[in-house]
């Protein structure tokens, strides 16, 4: 039975890898063609042509983003991802995630407020935890109005280390708070925002596999606070 399970696991890993390859290859080719066209149109094209091209590039980026998320979810759900926990600098992992969101925040004139210790080391997989933190930051920036603020803090408790991301957005109704970590779940009020509702689901899966958990506190009209708790 153990050998059969290992064989099935190997076959599933190979299947997902093949699907990933088949999906990524045409998207990579498309991106290369679009980059080439972009250079040519910027030199000789008209404003409408450039506008159409940017719309196509934006769509390609969204498809690639979704593809990567679906592949990650498939691997996580089937236990095909090996979480490599080591004692690492948590603040470095946080800074790396912040670096990926700064441009988006600057466009909306969102300011960050920090409440961080001088240093904090904790057992975690830096790559996967970084993705989980990025998802929380991305949501905070996405749902905070222009000119608002996002508060980021790290605190140490008796059993856990807490990473909290608080926004000044619309908030989440109490009746919806239990559902937001489900796959593809999105509140009716936020359907005008980009995304398909898998970021929080992926965040919870990543954190759970590292022995932690995720919580949310929110008030409609006042914003939301998401916390990642990791064992010390």
Annotate each language-model stretch with its function:
Residues 84-87, 106, 111-121:
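Conserved catalytic submotifs in the C-terminal HATPase_c
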Residues 212-213:
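Conserved glycine-rich
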């Amino acid at each position: 039975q153990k050998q059969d399970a290992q064989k099935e696991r190997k076959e599933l890993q190979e299947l997902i890898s093949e699907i990933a390859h088949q999906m990524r290859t045409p998207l990579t080719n498309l991106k290369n063609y679009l980059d080439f066209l972009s250079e040519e149109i910027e030199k000789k094209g008209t404003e409408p042509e450039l506008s159409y091209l940017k719309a196509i590039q934006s769509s390609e980026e969204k498809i690639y983003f979704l593809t990567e998320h679906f592949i990650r979810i498939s691997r996580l759900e089937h236990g095909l991802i090996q979480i490599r926990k080591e004692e690492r600098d948590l603040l470095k992992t946080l800074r790396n995630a912040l670096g990926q969101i700064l441009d988006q925040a600057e466009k909306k004139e969102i300011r960050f407020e920090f409440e961080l210790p001088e240093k904090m080391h904790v057992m975690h997989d830096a790559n996967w935890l970084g993705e989980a933190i990025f998802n929380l930051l991305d949501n905070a920036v996405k749902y905070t109005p222009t000119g608002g603020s996002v508060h980021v803090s790290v605190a140490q408790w008796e059993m856990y280390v807490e990473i909290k991301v608080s926004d000044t957005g619309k908030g989440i109704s109490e009746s919806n708070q239990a559902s937001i970590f489900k796959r593809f779940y999105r509140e009716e009020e936020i359907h005008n925002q980009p995304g398909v509702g898998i970021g929080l689901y992926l965040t919870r899966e990543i954190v759970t596999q590292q022995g932690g958990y995720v919580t949310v506190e929110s008030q409609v009209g006042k914003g939301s606070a998401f916390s990642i708790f990791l064992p010390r």
